[in-house]
Amino acid sequence: MSRRSSRLQAKQHAQPNQPDSPQETQIIQAKKRKTAQDVKKRKEEITKKHQYEIRNCWPPVLSGGISPCIIIETPHKEIGTSDFSRFTNYRFKNLFINPSPLPDLSWACSQEVWQNMLQKENRYVHDKHFQVLHSDLEPQMRSILLDWLLEVCEVYTLHRETFYLAQDFFDRFMLTQKDVNKNMLQLIGITSLFIASKLEEIYAPKLQEFAYVTDGACSEVDILKMELNILKALKWELCPVTVISWLNLFLQVDAVKDVPKVLLPQYSQETFIQIAQLLDLCILAIDSLEFQYRILAAAALCHFTSIEVVKKASGLEWDDISECVDWMVPFVSVVKSVSPVKLKTFKKIPMEDRHNIQTHTNYLALLNEVNYVNIYRKGGQLSPVCNGGIMTPPKSTEKPPGKH
């Protein structure tokens, strides 16, 4: 037996149980009454607080400035659930209700890979309204800059993914800044491409080459300083799932038949570059930032295939992409009105990888055509492009009889 137990037993034998004295009983009862009164008093105070609200004591005319307030007594109000239906942009999105369209993978869980991609899509935010933050900029300035970056990518045989990473870095960086001078756009753009090339390219161009293509507008020191600014502003979040990555994935999911070959492109390179050209043109328009990259890629795929293919490859329904599909109609009309883009061959680039090299065409002229189509659409008319391409006279064999 422990020493403590021995002491307790000895104490109990030395002091036998005795009934409480009347004085001690009165003290205990008084304490109980006091405690009950305190609890009741606190409840009354809480109830009283709920019966008061703050009301502006000045007329509505003066409510624009700082207004004194008074506290008035009001009837008790039940706290009701607010209507959150108007806060659509801030609702929690349950990513787990989207089943993975990916096939079974030998190297990872397809559902986990899919959920990770969706989480990235929601974490890397872009917004077409970033131009509101920059009073000195106009929408076409972004288009001109991105068109120039496309040309630089083609000259240095950079991959499409490199361009789309640079585009994402630029748009997200501009969303973190305010009142950027238009003279800084080229520096921000070329620095974004510099960062993207180091991430994506095996043999990235040297720093002096990026400075060279700016024709003296940006020095190597300027690019290095801006690189650090961009990385800090983006908090080193440099791994978005780009538009072109989604397109690659969707075409692969639709075409793959054999699981062991899932990592090798199984789709048509010609189909890929046709859709990629459409996305190149779309991304020049600042309104494209209104849509998630996954939606843009799925809408472009829908224009060249069918909604059934989109459902199979992306897991998206028509309601998810219908708005983007409609927005993309003028772009599709313009792209299909010109000669189809052809696969190019590049030195030191394997044939199986040539479709991934970024190419450039006169995108600014095509974008002007898109603007024309939009003007006609708003006026309720169909432009010549929307009517099926550029209008040309019929062949002599197709003319009506008697009009030769």
UniProtKB/Swiss-Prot annotation:
Phosphothreonine modified-residue sites: T392
Keyword Nucleus: yes or no? yes
Q: How is it modified after translation?
A: Phosphorylation by CDK2 triggers its release from CDK2 and degradation via the ubiquitin proteasome pathway. Lactylated at Lys-348. Delactylated by SIRT3.
Q: Which UniProt keywords apply?
A: Cell cycle, Cell division, Cyclin, Nucleus, Phosphoprotein
**SMART domains (alphabetical):** CYCLIN, Cyclin_C
* GO cellular component terms listed in the entry, alphabetical order: cyclin E2-CDK2 complex; nucleus
Tissues of expression: Highest levels in adult testis, thymus and brain. Lower levels in placenta, spleen and colon.
User: Which residues are modified to Phosphoserine?
Assistant: S21, S383
Record GO biological process = cell division; chromosome organization involved in meiotic cell cycle; DNA replication initiation; homologous chromosome pairing at meiosis; regulation of cell cycle; regulation of protein localization; telomere maintenance
Which residue ranges does UniProt annotate as crossing the membrane? none
**According to the lineage, what is the superkingdom?**
Eukaryota
Record PTM N6-lactoyllysine, positions in chain = K348
Q: Does the keyword Phosphoprotein apply?
A: yes
Subcellular location per UniProt equals: Nucleus
- Composition bias (Polar residues) maps to 7-28
Region Disordered, residue ranges: 1-41
One Pfam family this chain carries? Cyclin_N
Q: Which GO terms describe its molecular function?
A: cyclin-dependent protein serine/threonine kinase regulator activity; protein kinase binding
Question: What function does the entry list?
Answer: Essential for the control of the cell cycle at the late G1 and early S phase.
Give the family, as the similarity comment puts it.
Belongs to the cyclin family. Cyclin E subfamily.
Q: PANTHER family under this entry?
A: CYCLINS
Subunit record text: Interacts with the CDK2 (in vivo) and CDK3 (in vitro) protein kinases to form a serine/threonine kinase holoenzyme complex. The cyclin subunit imparts substrate specificity to the complex.
The protein depicted here goes by the name G1/S-specific cyclin-E2
